[in-house]
Amino acid sequence: EGPVGLADPDGPASAPLGAP
């Protein structure tokens, strides 16, 4: 989740698969 792109698709910069 968030700018790091963890597995949370609702993070501001996260893809559904948790892309960075």
UniProtKB/Swiss-Prot annotation:
Instruction: Say where the protein is mainly found.
Output: secreted
> Where, subcellularly, is it found?
Secreted
Membrane-crossing residue ranges in chain numbering: none
Keyword Electron transport assigned to the entry: answer is: no
Annotated region (Disordered), positions in chain: 1-20
Name its GO BP terms in alphabetical order: defense response to fungus; defense response to Gram-negative bacterium; defense response to Gram-positive bacterium; killing of cells of another organism
Taxonomically, the superkingdom here is Bacteria
Q: Which UniProt keywords apply?
A: Antimicrobial, Fungicide, Secreted
Signal sequence segment = none
Q: What does this protein do?
A: The synthetic peptide inhibits growth of fungus P.capsici and partially that of V.dahliae, F.graminearum and F.omysporum.
* The name this protein goes by in its record: Antimicrobial peptide EP-20
